[in-house]
Swiss-Prot record:
The keyword Cytoplasm does not apply. Its EC number is 4.2.3.6. This is Trichodiene synthase. GO terms for biological process: sesquiterpenoid biosynthetic process. Pathway: Sesquiterpene biosynthesis; trichothecene biosynthesis. It comes from the Eukaryota. Transmembrane segments: none annotated. It comes from Paramyrothecium roridum (Myrothecium leaf spot fungus).
Amino acid sequence: MDEFPTEYFLGTAVRLLENVKYRDSNYTREERIENLSYANNKAAAHFAQERQQRILKVNPKRLEASLRTIVGMVVYSWVKVSKELMADLSIHYTYTLILDDSEDDPHNNMLTFFDDLQAGREQKHPWWMLVNEHFPNVLRHFGPFCSLNLIRSTLDFFEGCWIEQYNFHGFPGSYDFPGFLRRMNGLGHCVGGSLWPKELFDEQKHFLEITSAVAQMENWMVWVNDLMSFYKEFDDPRDQTSLVKNYVVCDEISLTQALEKLTVDTLTSSEQMMEVFSDKDAKLMETIECFMHGYITWHLCDHRYRLKEVYEGTMHIETEDAIKFRKFYGQAAKVGAIEHEEWAFPTVAERIEVRLAEEKAAKDGQAVLTSAEPAVPQAAQEVLA
């Protein structure tokens, strides 16, 4: 398969959108911009701090791009939670995206991971240093069960990224490997657990429903992500260990067959999600449905996924799927296509510049005060001594 399978992708996307009854009415435009601005301001201020910059060593422009992507994901999808939780989750998931894009081998920094954890010492790995410092800000919003899901899933994610450092597709015949790796680095339990803040849900009262939601969300959100990422990953050398390409190697099938496998699984998961929770507590179902619709809007509108290119490429195609896709994309763009200039400011780089200028001014001011202090005569020094 040398050319991107446009028609097949359009059909798959349309079936997904129809299955979840896509109709994102989560916000007014003003509400969306307000939440984006709030989450971005707090998260950008966090990453512009001296400690974060010194330890992460990530280019501010690259960090800014990661932050914009994650703030969009959180605000569009975690519709029912407070703005404060949106901001705290934006910081946490930006850390995960930074790790996902990293190429550093964690081996040496992980040699004493458990010993340091048990002794309450700071971790050696710089990512864990900062994630652990911020984690209490996230976990304060949740009960113990949901918190455990967030902690465990974040740990799994780190291990999954570690495995991906080797660009390993799995061995031919290792049918369990693609799903194993994707569940590990998909953050499904972290996402599934973070939909239920204690200010909105009693996790003891809704324990069974929350457990089921975490189980269903584990696959749904990663498969939708893989499906919506297929276009951008198709010919990107940095994305060669995707789930679809791992299926090709491990299952020894063609790329078309691997995409079909992902498609069937995604559609089945969507049907199960809608069916399982349709007769449950209305507040639970509303949270799940709003997440699903917002998560899809984010994929369709975020520049990272380049789906606008697919939309524009269908203008000359008059098949039923192409027409439906353009209609769905138009619906998503109407509510979700908001340029970063409307909410992502000041940027991380601008905040760093201001911080450095303030630090320099304070240092210069201190130097002036020090030089202006009168010298203590020698005789007085002897008396004081």
